[in-house]
Structures are given as C-alpha cells and as structure tokens.
C-alpha cells in the first residue's frame, strides 16, 4: 500500500488518541518507520497490524479500528485536493458509486503501483443500493465500509449504514490474497447493502425515463450502426466476437500479416486483444454487465512485432483466400486494401530491424527501442443491447499524432466521424495511455534490475557466509580493506580440543561401516556447531575426529576461561542426549598466550600458534572418555568464580613431562 494510507492512520491516531497511544501502537507492531512517505510502498500487513494494536491499546474492537482507518483516509485525502475529484463525479451518491473504478483508473497515473479494488453498483432503490466489491486483498471489507460512510456524510450529507450480504474468500485480519493450491490466488468478493436516502436519485431517473426525449425511437439497422462506429466490437455471452466494425477488422488484418483473417470473427476477445483497463478484470459476461459504467481499454495483439511473422507475411497467399465466406463487403474491401500494405509494412519492419543498431529481444523479435511506441489502444465503454442480446464495445483508437496514424496504417477519414478524435490527432495530443505504456515498460525493466540486484546481494551473502566459516568476520573485514598484516598476538585465550572416540574401527574395510562413521561424526560435529556462541567462542577447525575451538580470539574476551568451560559442559550434555551407540567424547582445555593469523591462499584458514595450543591438545589426548581435563592454570582461574573442579594429580604429558591437571565437574550454581 502507498504511504498516504498509513499517513492518514498516523495523523488521526495522534490527533484523536494522542501521541503516547501512537507510540504504543508502533511498539506493539514493531514498526520501524517514524513517518511515512506519500508515494512510497509499504507492506500491506501493516494496516491490520495497526488495527489490532490500536484495539489492544484502546479496548475498541478490531472491526471498529478498521472502520476508523477507512474514515480517516477520506478525511485525510482532502488535504491533497482529491475531494474535488469525488465531488465532480455527480450530484448524487449513486453517481459516485458508479464512478469508483474510473476514479481508480485516473489515480494510477499518480500512483502507478496502486492495486485498487473493483466496485460495481448492482442494484438501487429508494432506500439505498447494493455494490459488489472485488479485491486481491483480504481483511479490508470493514475498511471500505468506513470509506463509504465518510464519503456519504462529508460530500453528500447522507447518514449511511452498511453491512455485508455475501462474502467469498475474505479472511479477517489478513491482507494477502487467499491462495488455492490448484489455481493460485483467489479473488475476494463481498456484496454490500448500503442503506441511505436515495429517493432524490430514483426520482431523477424516473423523470429522465418519462421525458419526451426518451420516447421509443425507430430501430436502427446494425450495418448503419457499424458505419457510425467503425471500431465497434459485438460480443456474445461467451465473450466471442460475433460482429465488428469495418476499421477494427482492417486494423487487425494490417497488424497480423500471415494470420488467416477468417479467425477474427468467432474468436474470443482475449485472443485478439489484451485488456489494459480495468486491470486484473475477469472478462466474463456477468462481470462485464456489472461494469458498463467503467471505462475499458484494450490493446490489439499483433504478430507484426515478430520478425518471423513478418517474413511469413511476404509469402502469404492473399489471392487464394476466400474472404467473402466470412466477411461482409466492407470488411472484404478492407482486406483487399491491406494486401499491398501488409507486405510493404513487413518489408519496412524487417529492413528496419536488420539495419537498426538497437538490440533485438531474442524472445519476441522486437526492437527494444520501439516496444510500446506503436501499440494500438482502443478506449471506450461496454453497452448491453437487449434487441440482439449482446455486448457492444463502443470505442475509438488512441492515436498521438499524424506520424503514428500513418505508422499503424490508418488515415484521418478512418477515425470515428463524431467526437474529437480527428482534431486531437491533428493537434498532436499526447494520450496518457501511451505514457502509461512507456512507464510500465520502464517499470518492468526496473523490476528486473531490482531482482538482479537482490540476486547479487543473495550471492554476496552466501559468499560472506562461506568466507566467515573459514575466517572470522573481523579478520575478513581487515583483509577486504587490503591490510597486509592480519596476524595478531593475544596475551591470554582458552583453547578447547574435543575428540570423538570409538567411532570407527581402523581395521575395518567395510564401506558401510565407513559411511556410518561419517554420518555419526557429522551428527556430533553438527551438535557442537550449534553450541558455538559467537563472539564468545570461535570454531577454529576440525581435523579427523578432533574439534578445535577458542575463546578470547579473534575477539578479546576477559571471561575466556569461563566461556570455554561452559562450552565443554554444554557439549557433554548435548552429545549424551543423542545417545549414539558406543560413541564417547573427551575434552581438554588450556589457557595462555597465542599468535593467530590467516594461513593459505586457495583455502585460507584462521590458525592459532603457540605452546598454549600444544598443551591444550595434550590435555585432550590424555583425558578420559566423558571427562573434561583442565590444565593447572585454567583450573585455578575458573575455580575462583565458582566452577567445581577435582584434582586428578600429575599426568605424564608428551613433550612436557609431568603436569598437574584437574577434572571439570560442573559450573557455578
């Protein structure tokens, strides 16, 4: 959702409930935004989250809060001058209800990423009306009631109450569209009953119907009608094209060279046109009947963009095509006039594509610089004609200037004789729809760029995680800065060695035994990895059956001995809990000075050097199963802070002679 919706929530919560309540709401929601930007997109889930938080803070119901947010938005958008747009839709509230979708269409030029719902007025009487709401979001039905109530009160002076008659796929408190695994996202459909004083509007309708100007006129022949509206399309209940005006057929043939013209009549409208407005509309009979007051915009689907289709057009046998069997005389004449233009246009496009320095899209064969520049848009309204039980799309093409008119193979006398179509083309007006297409193309490229950047960031994070598994983060950051000296001496650290025992019989040549040993070792080492808590303890390496860790490096830690002992105690407890048959571990810990640095080029490793490391290794190798052996210095250090140790006595250590060692029994209380 755009930030303007959340701006209204923030403003009126602060105004009516106080700044402290707003802070509490943000704290409950864990909202990091101190303020909202009008044209920035924010997560949809914030709206129900704010409503739930306000409900918890004030004691009001969730539905009341969503209704309150809807009323707040209507009051708030008047600051942007949008109240004038609402007031200009008509004298009556029903006029506004019929214009909601058209308002959303216009608002998309300012808010291009707006995912607006669709609303149609389905029934009216003296006591109110019924509207049908469709949306890809759930949980917003009470929000809409708040909006409708406030619009009726502020702009039309009506006291309105609303309630839900029917509801499909709506989920209270949600915002993402419901999903069916076999079909994908579902549409939320809610039918509302709006109760208000609608007598004035109904009386006006009766007066209009009874006016002498509305007396029944003689029938008009359909051919005459198609001459008056040469871009008309007639649709049956299956939304298939049953009839079409002369110019729309001619235009389709010109821009679909190589396609059998017989296929136009009888085809589904979405096979020949793409619905651009209203967006995400289901092109079905019942749906379109309810949207007769809504402005529609269709884009002609052309094979002319495809270079292969243009090449095929050069060899298309127009002479042997039997057009008279499916097209009327005017349409057949249009086909005849298209013969020369189709081949000529195909040659021009192919030559331009061959000589152009612009990139050709390998998927579509389109020249990237021309995408969207010559799209043919038809803008108009759907009407139901009872006499023929059909829908008629009365439309006219949106053409920017004379250059574009010639580019799509039309002339001024081809345009509708009524209206200002010809005058606008002569004046060179820039239609907003053309700008919108260009904007959508750029937005699509922007989205692709964002996805590429996100993918690059993901790869970078994976690379960082791999690097940090071999080298500590502080050291890696220093290496990135091209620091030559990454070696560091530490006055005192605690080194831990953990060996897994009885895991593999070295005399066995059985592959299954070896695989079992690897699986068991992986379980133990994975359990040890889970107990490593950075930055208190750092895993150095694993060699064979031995696991090495250190506390106090690379991050200096004055409590290194305590953290090393804590790790050893946790590891003992966790490995015992796994109850691996015959498997045991032994641990050795020693404290003292070390030197640390990165060694290697292809597979760099963070290594520790010094007598402290050797002594810690001897503490482990001379320890007993399920025991933790400490050097004398480490034992005295942790004993002072409450760790329970037991003297083992003097142990003969390779290269050291006899050393006094201790068993670590448990940590402090």
Swiss-Prot record:
InterPro entries: A/G_cyclase, A/G_cyclase_CS, H-NOX_domain_sf, Heme_NO-bd, HNOB_dom_associated, HNOB_dom_associated_sf, NO_sig/Golgi_transp_ligand-bd, Nucleotide_cyclase. Residues 430-458 form a coiled coil. One of its GO terms (molecular function) is guanylate cyclase activity. Keywords: cGMP biosynthesis, Coiled coil, Cytoplasm, GTP-binding, Heme, Iron, Lyase, Magnesium, Manganese, Metal-binding, Nucleotide-binding. It holds the Pfam family HNOBA. Probably not activated by nitric oxide (NO). Heterodimer exhibits some stimulation, compounds (SIN-1 and two of the NONOates) that were ineffective at stimulating Gyc-88E homodimer did stimulate the heterodimer. Residues 494-620 form the Guanylate cyclase domain. Heterodimers with Gyc88E are activated in response to changing oxygen concentrations, alerting flies to hypoxic environments. Under normal oxygen concentrations, oxygen binds to the heme group and results in low levels of guanylyl cyclase activity. When exposed to reduced oxygen concentrations, the oxygen dissociates from the heme group resulting in activation of the enzyme. Belongs to the adenylyl cyclase class-4/guanylyl cyclase family. This is Soluble guanylate cyclase 89Db. It comes from Drosophila melanogaster. The gene is Gyc89Db.
